[in-house]
C-alpha cells in the first residue's frame, strides 16, 4: 500500500484570534480534498483556498526547533507563541487542559515543554494543525520568544522536497504491538460487559470467572481456567481472543468490539508502556548501510552499527535491511512507523542510493585480513588478474572456470582468482557471514569446490536463497527465532534432550560445523505467529494443538497420554517456537531438520493406564480417566445459559502447599481442569494427612513425573 504523506496546517492569528494566514503544507502539488486537514479548513474555519506551500514540518523537531522553523516559514522576526487546539505544545497547564494564550490564566500554573513534536502531538502523522501568534498580541506576551532557525533543518527540508517525486513509498507493515491497558473496570465493570454480551445476543463466546485461593466461581459459555483471581475473556466468532481483562488491566485485540461493549461505562484507559515492533516491507530496495552527509541530529542519531539508527529521543530504534525496515517504539503512536519509513527512504534517496560494491582492494581488505588471510601453510586471499585465460568455460555472467583456475568478476569488473603456490586453496568461494548480513560477495579461497554452497548460488547465479537457507550460526536461547535462524535450548532442557548427542562447533564462534543430530529451537512453520500471553492462552493452545509445550521450566501436556502428538513446542517471549533435531555435514552448509525425540518428555507424563475410581456420588463418578455421569464420559461444552458454583473447601496452608505442585506437569482441557479442581476438593474432604498426600496421589497416578525427575 502506498503511504501518503499527510498535509499539515499552519495558522497565523491576530489579536482577536482571527486567521491572518492559512498555510497548507504538502510535498505534493495539490490540495487533497479528502484529507481531514482540508475538511477542518472548510468546515470549521470556512477557508476554501489556503496558501499551498511545498514544505513539510518534520515531526521529530523539538519545540524550540519547531518555533525557529515556523518563524522562518511565516517570516516573523518578533517573539511568537505556538499552540494547538488539539494538544499542548510549548506550554501546558498543570491540569493538562488545552493551552490557549488568548485566554486569561494564572501564569504560575503554566509549564514549559521542549519535547519532540510526535510525542506531544500523538496524531501528528495524520493530522497536524499549529497555531502561531505574535506574543504581543496575546494575554501573556512575556511567555513569547524568538528562536533562530537551524539552517540544517531548512537544508534537509529543501533536499527532501527535491527528491520526494522520486520516492517509492509502496510499503507493507506487519506489527507486533502492545495492546495492554491499565483500566478501572474492576469486577463491577466486567459484570456489566458480560451482561451486555448476553443482552446483545451476538453469539460471542465469553467467560467471566472469579476464583478464591483454590479456584472457582464462574459464568460464561467458554470455560478456561487461568491463574488470575478475576478474569473476563471474550472470543471472536472465529475463535480468536478479542479481549481479556482482570479488572485492572485489559488486553484488546478487537478495538471495535471493546468500544461497543463499554459505550455506557465510564472507562479510564492508560496504555501500559511496552515495546512495539513494526516490520515494514519495501517495494524498492534501499541501501542498509546508511551514511548521513549533513547534520541530521534533529531526525536520527547514528550508531556504531551502520544499519541501526535511533530517534533523537533514543526511544525509537530503526534497523535497516535491503528489503525491509524494523522499527521498535516504546509506546503506540499512530502511523509513526510509516512516517519514519518515509524519512529513511528519503534519506536513502538523498545520500545512500544503492551503489555497486567498491573494489575489494580499497574496502574489503579489512575483511580479508581478519577472516580470509594468508598464513604460513594457507593461501586463502584471492589475487586480482587483468584477463581471462583462453578456453575458460563461462559458468555465469560473473564466473569462469578451467581445469587450472576459477575466476570471479565483481560488479566493478575486477577479476579475482585463487593461485595457491602449494596447490591446495584454489577453489573460489565467498564469505558466508558478510553475505548473510549484507549480501556482500567477498571472495575467498577454499580447499574444496564451493558450487554446492548457498552463498555461491546467490553470488554466481543470483539465486535468492534468503528464505530457503538457515544460517548455521546458533543463537543463545531467549531471543525470538526468525525463519532463517535457530537457537540453543535452555540449559536444563539442552542437557536433558541432548544427553548423548553432540554438535561440533567452529572454534571461537557458534557456527555449527557438523552434527548427526542435536535438539535446537526453530520458528514454527507457516506464516502465522502464535502468541500466548496468559496461562489461559497456554491451556487452550495445548488443548487444541495436542502437543507438548515448554514454558520456562514447566512442561505442559494435553490431558490424556493418547492425545500427545509428536511435536515439542517452546515459548520464547510469548511466541510459540518449535523444538527440532538438526543434522549437518561438515562438507556442506545444508541443514536438515527432523522431528524431536518427543518420547523423552512424554515419558514424564503422569499417566494412569488403568481407569481407577476416585470418588462417586449419585451416579457421578470421578476416575483417573475422566468424569462420568451415569456411566457416560462428561464431555459437553459448558454454556453461558447456566451458572456453576463450586464451593471450595477451606484447607490449611500446609495442605494447599503440598497440593500446589502435584499437577505441575499436567495441563488439561477446561472442563477437565474443572474436574481436577473438584478432585482436589474431594481429596481434602477425604481428610488426607499432609504427610500422606504424595502416597495417596501415587495410588491413583503411579507415574507422577515427580519420581522420574528426582
Curated annotation (Swiss-Prot):
<dbReference type="GO" id="GO:0044423">
    <property type="term" value="C:virion component"/>
</dbReference>
<comment type="function">
    <text>Acts with RNA polymerase to initiate transcription from early gene promoters. Is recruited by the RPO-associated protein of 94 kDa RAP94/OPG109 to form the early transcription complex, which also contains the core RNA polymerase. ETF heterodimer binds to early gene promoters.</text>
</comment>
<protein>
    <recommendedName>
        <fullName>Early transcription factor 82 kDa subunit</fullName>
    </recommendedName>
</protein>
<keyword id="KW-0946">Virion</keyword>
<comment type="subunit">
    <text>Heterodimer of a 70 kDa and a 82 kDa subunit. Part of the early transcription complex composed of ETF, RAP94/OPG109, and the DNA-directed RNA polymerase.</text>
</comment>
<keyword id="KW-0010">Activator</keyword>
<keyword id="KW-0804">Transcription</keyword>
<keyword id="KW-0426">Late protein</keyword>
<dbReference type="GO" id="GO:0003677">
    <property type="term" value="F:DNA binding"/>
</dbReference>
<keyword id="KW-0805">Transcription regulation</keyword>
<comment type="similarity">
    <text>Belongs to the poxviridae VETF large subunit family.</text>
</comment>
<dbReference type="InterPro" id="IPR007532">
    <property type="entry name" value="Poxvirus_early-TF_lsu"/>
</dbReference>
<dbReference type="GO" id="GO:0045893">
    <property type="term" value="P:positive regulation of DNA-templated transcription"/>
</dbReference>
<dbReference type="Pfam" id="PF04441">
    <property type="entry name" value="Pox_VERT_large"/>
</dbReference>
<keyword id="KW-0238">DNA-binding</keyword>
Amino acid at each position: 500500500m502506498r503511504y501518503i504523506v499527510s498535509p499539515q496546517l499552519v495558522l497565523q492569528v491576530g489579536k482577536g484570534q482571527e486567521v491572518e494566514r492559512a498555510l497548507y503544507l504538502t510535498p505534493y502539488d495539490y490540495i487533497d480534498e479528502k484529507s481531514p486537514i482540508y475538511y477542518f479548513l472548510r468546515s470549521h474555519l470556512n477557508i476554501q483556498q489556503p496558501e499551498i506551500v511545498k514544505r513539510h514540518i518534520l515531526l521529530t523537531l523539538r519545540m524550540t526547533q519547531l518555533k525557529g522553523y515556523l518563524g522562518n516559514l511565516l517570516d516573523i522576526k518578533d517573539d511568537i507563541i505556538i499552540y494547538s487546539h488539539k494538544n499542548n505544545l510549548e506550554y501546558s497547564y498543570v491540569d493538562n487542559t488545552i493551552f490557549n494564550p488568548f485566554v486569561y490564566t494564572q501564569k504560575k500554573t503554566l509549564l514549559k515543554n521542549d519535547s519532540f513534536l510526535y510525542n506531544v502531538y500523538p496524531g501528528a502523522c495524520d493530522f497536524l494543525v499549529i497555531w502561531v501568534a505574535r506574543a504581543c498580541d496575546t494575554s501573556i506576551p512575556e511567555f513569547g520568544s524568538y528562536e533562530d532557525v537551524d539552517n540544517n533543518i531548512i537544508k534537509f527540508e529543501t533536499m527532501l522536497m527535491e527528491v520526494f517525486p522520486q520516492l517509492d513509498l509502496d510499503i507493507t507493515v506487519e506489527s507486533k504491538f502492545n495492546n495492554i491497558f491499565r483500566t478501572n473496570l474492576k469486577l463491577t465493570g466486567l459484570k456489566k460487559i458480560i451482561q451486555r454480551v448476553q443482552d446483545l445476543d451476538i453469539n460471542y463466546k465469553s467467560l467471566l470467572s472469579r476464583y478464591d485461593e483454590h479456584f472457582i466461581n464462574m459464568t460464561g459459555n467458554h470455560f478456561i481456567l487461568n491463574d488470575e483471581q478475576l478474569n473476563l475473556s471474550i472470543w471472536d466468532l472465529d475463535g480468536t481472543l478479542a479481549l481479556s481483562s482482570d479488572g485492572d488491566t485489559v488486553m484488546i485485540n478487537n478495538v471495535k468490539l471493546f468500544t461497543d461493549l463499554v459505550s455506557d461505562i465510564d472507562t479510564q484507559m492508560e496504555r501500559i508502556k511496552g515495546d512495539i515492533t513494526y516490520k515494514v516491507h519495501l517495494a524498492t530496495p534501499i541501501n542498509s548501510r546508511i551514511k548521513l552527509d549533513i547534520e541530521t541530529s534533529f531526525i536520527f542519531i547514528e550508531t556504531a552499527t551502520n544499519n541501526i539508527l535511533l530517534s533523537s529521543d533514543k526511544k525509537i530504534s530503526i534497523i535497516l535491511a535491503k528489503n525491509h525496515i524494523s522499527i521498535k517504539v516504546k509506546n503506540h503512536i499512530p502511523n509513526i512507523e510509516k512516517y519514519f519509513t518515509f524519512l529513511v527512504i528519503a534519506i536513502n534517496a538523498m545520500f545512500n542510493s544503492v551503489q555497486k560494491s567498491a573494489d575489494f582492494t580499497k574496502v574489503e581488505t579489512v575483511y580479508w585480513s581478519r577472516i580470509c588471510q594468508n598464513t604460513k601453510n594457507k593461501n586463502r586471499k584471492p589475487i586480482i588478474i587483468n584477463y581471462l585465460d583462453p578456453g575458460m568455460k563461462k559458468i555465469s555472467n560473473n564466473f569462469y572456470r578451467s581445469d587450472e583456475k576459477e575466476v570471479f568478476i565483481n560488479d566493478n569488473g575486477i577479476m579475482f582468482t585463487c593461485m595457491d603456490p602449494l596447490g591446495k586453496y584454489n577453489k573460489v568461494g565467498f564469505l558466508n557471514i558478510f553475505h548473510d548480513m549484507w549480501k556482500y560477495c567477498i571472495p575467498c579461497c577454499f580447499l574444496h569446490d564451493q558450487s554446492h554452497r548457498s552463498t555461491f548460488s546467490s553470488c554466481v547465479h543470483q539465486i535468492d536463497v534468503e528464505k530457503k537457507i538457515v544460517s548455521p550460526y546458533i543463537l543463545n536461547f531467549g531471543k525470538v527465532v526468525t525463519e532463517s535462524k535457530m537457537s540453543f535450548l535452555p540449559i536444563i532442557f539442552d542437557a536433558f534432550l541432548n544427553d548423548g548427542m553432540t554438535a561440533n562447533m567452529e572454534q571461537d564462534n557458534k557456527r555449527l560445523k557438523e552434527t548427526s543430530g542435536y535438539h535446537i529451537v526453530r520458528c514454527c512453520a507457516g506464516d502465522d505467529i502464535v502468541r500466548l500471553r496468559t496461562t489461559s492462552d497456554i491451556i487452550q493452545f495445548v488443548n487444541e494443538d495436542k502437543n507438548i509445550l515448554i514454558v520456562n521450566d514447566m512442561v505442559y501436556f494435553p490431558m490424556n497420554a493418547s492425545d500427545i502428538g509428536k511435536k515439542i513446542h517452546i515459548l520464547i517471549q510469548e511466541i510459540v517456537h518449535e523444538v527440532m533435531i538438526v543434522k549437518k555435514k561438515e562438507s556442506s552448509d545444508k541443514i536438515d531438520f527432523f522431528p524431536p525425540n518427543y518420547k523423552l518428555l512424554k515419558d514424564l507424563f503422569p499417566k494412569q493406564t488403568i481407569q481407577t475410581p476416585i470418588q462417586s456420588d449419585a451416579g457421578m463418578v470421578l476416575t483417573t480417566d475422566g468424569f462420568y455421569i451415569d456411566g457416560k464420559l462428561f464431555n459437553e461444552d459448558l454454556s453461558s445459559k447456566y451458572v456453576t458454583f463450586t464451593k471450595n473447601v477451606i484447607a490449611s496452608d500446609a495442605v494447599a502447599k503440598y497440593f500446589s505442585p502435584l499437577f505441575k506437569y499436567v495441563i488439561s482441557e477446561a472442563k477437565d481442569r474443572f474436574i481436577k479442581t473438584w478432585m482436589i476438593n474431594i481429596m481434602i474432604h477425604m481428610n488426607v494427612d499432609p504427610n500422606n498426600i504424595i502416597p495417596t496421589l501415587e495410588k491413583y497416578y503411579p507415574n507422577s513425573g515427580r519420581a522420574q525427575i528426582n
